[in-house]
């Protein structure tokens, strides 16, 4: 049997900005197997489109999938089945609390951060988990729907997001930043309760000199960018987090 000589040889597929059919993704998985990959991260939600069937979203009045292009949950189960046969781990990726413009456009305006950070270019794509308990509850419900679905399908890891929820993380007060970290820890706990290992992108977590929080050390960190005041790899390692670079 031939296999990768590294622990995590992964392929990230953005199937949210651009829609890919079930058959196309299955064909890619087969090719990845021949190239000794051992995992594929399927990123199915972006500002440009939410591409996986959702009971939570379909309950919103007027909600529509962009161009009616999306994978059904049955499609995803078939993708996971083929991936298992080819020894490719499927890692779902649902970015939050930002990159959710395709969802927020169907929700009340105060569900987004537009009123809190009016000068920030990404405000309308970020859920207001600071002052709107209904918005926070909705987002937790959405994350829980897919944590439940993918854990029941046998997936072991889940990327809960964490990147680019605002253009300037320095806009946060210390109290607001603590709320962000509490959100990540809460979603992490939900994933762990279902036997999944949570992961996030690095740029929005442990940022700058904010204090008063402790990031869950069980969260895997996908270290993809290092803008000013971002936590270093060393800082994550000291916190106990596994870093993927």
State the predicted function of each range.
Residues 1-159, 163, 190:
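Feature activates predominantly on carbohydrate-active enzymes
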Residues 123-220, 224-241:
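Active-site neighborhood of glycoside hydrolase catalytic domains
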């Amino acid at each position: 049997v031939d296999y990768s000589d590294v622990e995590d040889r992964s392929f990230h597929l953005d199937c949210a900005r651009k829609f890919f059919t079930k058959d196309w993704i299955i064909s890619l998985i087969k090719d990845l197997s021949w190239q000794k990959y051992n995992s594929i991260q399927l990123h199915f939600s972006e500002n440009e489109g939410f591409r996986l069937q959702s009971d939570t979203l379909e309950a919103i009045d007027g909600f529509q999938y962009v161009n009616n292009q999306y994978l059904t949950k049955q499609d995803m189960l078939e993708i996971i089945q083929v991936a298992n046969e080819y020894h490719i781990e499927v890692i779902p990726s649902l970015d939050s609390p930002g990159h959710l413009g395709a969802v927020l456009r169907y929700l009340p305006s105060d569900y987004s951060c537009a009123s809190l950070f009016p000068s920030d270019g990404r405000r309308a794509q970020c859920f207001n988990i600071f002052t709107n308990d209904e918005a926070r509850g909705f987002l937790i419900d959405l994350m829980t729907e897919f944590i439940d679905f993918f854990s029941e399908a046998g997936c072991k890891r889940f990327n809960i997001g964490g990147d680019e929820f605002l253009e300037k993380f320095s806009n946060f007060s210390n109290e607001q930043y603590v709320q962000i970290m509490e959100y990540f820890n809460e979603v992490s706990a939900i994933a762990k309760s279902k036997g999944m290992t949570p992961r996030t992108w690095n740029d929005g977590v442990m940022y700058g000199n904010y204090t008063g929080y402790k990031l869950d050390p069980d969260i895997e960190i996908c270290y993809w960018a290092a803008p000013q005041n971002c936590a270093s790899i060393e800082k994550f390692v000291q916190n106990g987090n596994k870093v993927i670079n």
